[in-house]
Amino acid sequence: MHQQKRQPELVEGNLPVFVFPTELIFYADDQSTHKQVLTLYNPYEFALKFKVLCTTPNKYVVVDAAGAVKPQCCMDIVIRHRDVRSCHYGVIDKFRLQVSEQSQRKALGRKEVVATLLPSAKEQQKEEEEKRIKEHLTESLFFEQSFQPENRTVSSGPSLLTVFLAVVCITALMLPTLGDVESLVPLYLHLSVNQKLVAAYILGLITMAIFRT
């Protein structure tokens, strides 16, 4: 005897609701945008009842504000803005879609969609462009400030190794030359002319490097 497979009981308010888009933008100067379409998707194995609520229902007309969506199907919900006035520019309204099983009254899930009326699409594009330029300038200043400490570190002066080599070369040039019998310096510290030329050459390179830093 086969037992009937029972569907697990769903917790109220935890069912994900799939709606697109999640934001509606109406433009006062473009009548084609005064009508928007919300698409409600039902990816589940059971039918869903839905209801559309609004924070300001007097400003909108919702076609099919309540209904049902078959399993693994979708449904378009048409929303019209009927109060296009300048006093509503920039005001954010909200729609809430509540879904439930056809056999139950409790809401299994909900999804909110924001709606905004703007004066013009061109003004919106201009504001977005100005915002993008401002963000770009801010980023440029950020990177410039980030690199300043590195520049100061590089130009902090000659390294200890450079100073040490310069001192060695100067000391070598001050030592007596081979054949200088009147010097009190031990003979093993006497340098040849070629050795002093090498020391002078290295000292010149070090001096140029110090001036460049």
UniProtKB/Swiss-Prot annotation:
Pfam family, one: Motile_Sperm
Protein species of origin: Bos taurus (Bovine)
Superkingdom of origin: Eukaryota
The entry's keywords: Endoplasmic reticulum, Golgi apparatus, Membrane, Transmembrane, Transmembrane helix
Motif Nuclear export signal per record, residues: 205-208
Chief location category: endoplasmic reticulum
GO cellular component labels: cytoplasm; endoplasmic reticulum membrane; Golgi membrane; nucleus; perinuclear region of cytoplasm
Taxonomic path: Eukaryota, Metazoa, Chordata, Craniata, Vertebrata
PANTHER family the record matches: MOTILE SPERM DOMAIN-CONTAINING PROTEIN 1
Membrane-spanning segments: 159-179, 191-211
The protein's name in its UniProt record: Motile sperm domain-containing protein 1
Known role: Plays a role in differentiation and/or proliferation of mesenchymal stem cells. Proposed to be involved in epithelial-to-mesenchymal transition (EMT). However, another study suggests that it is not required for EMT or stem cell self-renewal and acts during later stages of differentiation.
